């Protein structure tokens, strides 16, 4: 038995498979950060930190002895509970293909948004510096007129090239900006197609946890997401009508360079 205690849950294999697939599909649909950073691991739930490669001086109490302490990025542990009905579980055994897994979807969305917020906007309380606040480049203003969005992206691309950051470049858009870009045209030509041509090999990525937009290089080596325990489902408790489960993951995030992104802000 591991730390997830799944063996104690009154859930047969076929129902587990449906729950896991729903969680995986929803998480993947909502996640954006993993598409633009280097991902290492998973190395296991027991992993608690990743080295930054730096040290700091520690006052020595012995004459002639130097003491250094290695600096690490401690992992954070995300967990979100959800409840499924035993009716939905048992219906799978009866051959149902339409059990209600909405609680699974809601939990997967919650944890995906939390991971992306940490990567993109940081989590000060946990010592995680996000890509947006850590950028050394001045933010480019998102224009009021969506027809001018391509000009803002061109400006951001120019910034990255000027500071020597190679592509490919990807453009992350908040839900609101993604909708505007996808639904708008400029003299009959789709704005999204114009942006795609600007990016070349890069992607336009829906990022619901992002505020505004973000142009980032995906050349590699700039940002690292270190997974301890990747997204997993664990068991809390059950009664005669419901089973309480949870989604959990652990990770640390390192922003290794500060010049390889340009925020686009409202």
Curated annotation (Swiss-Prot):
Summary of the protein's practical applications: Can be used as a bionanoreactor following immobilization on a glass surface. Nanocompartments filled with a fluorescent-labeled protein are stable for 5 years at 4 degrees Celsius and are taken up by mouse macrophages.
GO cellular component, alphabetical, reads: encapsulin nanocompartment
Arranged from A to Z, the UniProt key words for this protein are:
Encapsulin nanocompartment
Where found in the cell? Encapsulin nanocompartment
Would I find Coiled coil among this entry's keywords?
Answer: no
| Pfam families referenced in this protein's UniProt entry, alphabetically | Linocin_M18
Keyword Cell division included in the entry's annotation: no
Q: What is stated as this protein's family in its record?
A: Belongs to the encapsulin family. Family 1 subfamily.
What else does UniProt say about it? Other cargo proteins can be targeted to this compartment.
State the oligomer form and interacting partners.
Homomultimeric. This encapsulin nanocompartment is formed by 60 subunits, and encloses one Dyp homohexamer; partially assembled 58-subunit compartments with and without cargo are also purified. May assemble the shell from dimers. Monomers form pentamers, which assemble to form hollow shells with pores 5-8 Angstroms in diameter where 3 pentamers meet.
- Function field: Shell component of a type 1 encapsulin nanocompartment. Assembles into proteinaceous shells 23-24 nm in diameter with 2-2.5 nm thick walls. Endogenous cargo protein DyP (dye-decolorizing peroxidase) is targeted to the interior via its C-terminal extension; only 1 DyP hexamer is incorporated into each shell. Empty shells can be isolated in the absence of cargo. Cargo encapsulation probably precedes assembly of the nanocompartment; may assemble or disassemble via dimers, subcomplexes with a distinct preference for even numbers of subunits are detected.
Q: Give the protein's recorded name.
A: Type 1 encapsulin shell protein
Native organism is Brevibacterium linens
Name of the gene this protein is made from = enc
């Amino acid at each position: 038995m591991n730390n997830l205690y799944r063996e104690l849950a009154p859930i047969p294999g076929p129902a587990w498979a449906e729950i896991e697939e729903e969680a995986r599909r929803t998480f993947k649909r909502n996640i954006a950060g993993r598409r633009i950073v280097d991902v290492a691991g998973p190395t296991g739930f027991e992993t608690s930190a990743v080295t930054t490669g730096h040290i700091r001086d520690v006052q020595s109490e012995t004459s002639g002895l130097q003491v250094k302490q290695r600096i690490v990025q401690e992992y954070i542990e995300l967990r979100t509970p959800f409840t499924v009905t035993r009716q939905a579980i048992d219906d799978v055994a009866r051959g149902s293909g339409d059990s209600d897994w909405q609680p699974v979807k809601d939990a997967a969305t919650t944890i995906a948004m939390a991971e992306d917020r940490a990567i993109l906007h940081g989590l000060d309380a946990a010592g995680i510096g996000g890509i947006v606040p850590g950028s050394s480049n001045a933010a480019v203003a998102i224009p009021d007129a969506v027809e001018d969005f391509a000009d803002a992206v061109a400006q951001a691309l120019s910034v990255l090239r000027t500071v020597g950051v190679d592509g490919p470049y990807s453009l992350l858009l908040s839900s609101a900006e993604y909708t505007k870009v996808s639904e708008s045209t400029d003299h009959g030509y789709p704005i999204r197609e114009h942006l795609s041509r600007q990016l070349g090999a890069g992607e336009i990525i829906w990022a619901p946890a992002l505020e505004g937009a973000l142009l980032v290089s995906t050349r590699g080596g700039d940002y690292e997401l270190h997974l301890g325990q990747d997204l997993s489902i664990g068991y809390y408790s059950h009664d005669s009508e419901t089973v309480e489960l949870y989604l959990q993951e652990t990770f640390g995030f390192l922003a290794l360079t500060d010049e390889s992104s340009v925020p686009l802000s409202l």
